[in-house]
Amino acid sequence: MSQPKKRKLESGGGGEGGEGTEEEDGAEREAALERPRRTKRERDQLYYECYSDVSVHEEMIADRVRTDAYRLGILRNWAALRGKTVLDVGAGTGILSIFCAQAGARRVYAVEASAIWQQAREVVRFNGLEDRVHVLPGPVETVELPEQVDAIVSEWMGYGLLHESMLSSVLHARTKWLKEGGLLLPASAELFIAPISDQMLEWRLGFWSQVKQHYGVDMSCLEGFATRCLMGHSEIVVQGLSGEDVLARPQRFAQLELSRAGLEQELEAGVGGRFRCSCYGSAPMHGFAIWFQVTFPGGESEKPLVLSTSPFHPATHWKQALLYLNEPVQVEQDTDVSGEITLLPSRDNPRRLRVLLRYKVGDQEEKTKDFAMED
């Protein structure tokens, strides 16, 4: 089960974001603090309910880059899966579990916490695999399996990789149910960052200066207002870019090995790192884009398979996560861009992604900005 791509998480309480300099931001935070915070059980229930709708699963399976990568990543590991047991964490409609059965798995435990488990069971039965794929309703943290498993498969990645914190469920399953030396599909993840010039945003910011030539009314005075509205917020914007929007060589700032002990604690404390790059040429810099890739082991004779959400690769439903500066900054060839980025769970809702960004562009003073995924 992946994140509800077109749905919003409920935060149920005060949140982070921004630099705290605008009066309206302060008023909004005060109002948020007055709202009662939801309990973990309530947050989880709302999260699971998002997956009871067919649209979420349609979007995920229709993403050919995603679904083909999982199918190939599983089938290429047929030698490790043949005659073995597999746990599918967050099985959704069951397609990954069926891929595992097609690869020769003896038994697949498809664990799904949302009501869509009923449709998963129907799909399994419709494909004649009910003797090998067992759909188990409930969160993986509470479901009991009859045995340890040889492999775990899961599509746990959210926007910006870590939105919705599903990786923690996979790690719980790894610790409790995976045999020593067992297979994880995918096995690792990497995070990247790069400065960007958003062409669509640039057009929108300049729109108000173009009104006069069309209608004879000068509205260029609204450019500053448009900039505050479109860039001055603290939301992580999920949007697809092209390679042309990237202003410098992407920098990897984090790598997660899912087999690594202690990864759960790292996620709670925050995943991140430093970065430094030089701009290719002259352009308005609007912010940063972050994206990820995950890697599947190659099997006995194949190279590892990489599923990338880079703007230089075919588009996926994950797109990229954009972090806008408060206003554009003009950069030139070889302008130095550096900083530090940390991804961590929000305080009010651990499933909601928060990003802390410290950055410096050229000779400008260092700045910081606190972002959060939209509720």
UniProtKB/Swiss-Prot annotation:
PROSITE patterns: SAM_MT_PRMT. SUPFAM superfamilies: S-adenosyl-L-methionine-dependent methyltransferases. One of its GO terms (cellular component) is nucleus. Automethylation enhances its stability and antiretroviral activity. The modification Phosphothreonine is found at T21. It is found in: Nucleus. Pfam families: Methyltransf_25, PRMT_C. GO terms for biological process: base-excision repair; cellular senescence; chromatin remodeling; methylation; negative regulation of DNA-templated transcription; negative regulation of transcription by RNA polymerase II; negative regulation of ubiquitin-dependent protein catabolic process; protein modification process. The active site is at E155, E164. Residues 28-38 have a biased composition (Basic and acidic residues). The keyword Repressor applies. The modification Asymmetric dimethylarginine is found at R29, R35, R37. Disulfide bonds: none annotated. S-adenosyl-L-methionine binds at H57, R66, G90, E112, E141. Keywords: Chromatin regulator, DNA damage, DNA repair, Host-virus interaction, Methylation, Methyltransferase, Nucleus, Phosphoprotein, Repressor, S-adenosyl-L-methionine, Transcription, Transcription regulation, Transferase. Residues 44-374 form the SAM-dependent MTase PRMT-type domain. Its EC number is 2.1.1.319. Highly expressed in kidney and testis. Residues 1-38 are annotated as: Disordered. GO terms for molecular function: chromatin binding; histone arginine N-methyltransferase activity; histone binding; histone H2AR3 methyltransferase activity; histone H3 methyltransferase activity; histone H3R2 methyltransferase activity; histone H4R3 methyltransferase activity; histone methyltransferase activity. It catalyses: L-arginyl-[protein] + 2 S-adenosyl-L-methionine = N(omega),N(omega)-dimethyl-L-arginyl-[protein] + 2 S-adenosyl-L-homocysteine + 2 H(+). Belongs to the class I-like SAM-binding methyltransferase superfamily. Protein arginine N-methyltransferase family. PRMT6 subfamily. Interacts with EPB41L3 and NCOA1. (Microbial infection) Interacts with (and methylates) HIV-1 Tat, Rev and Nucleocapsid protein p7 (NC). This is Protein arginine N-methyltransferase 6. It comes from Homo sapiens (Human).
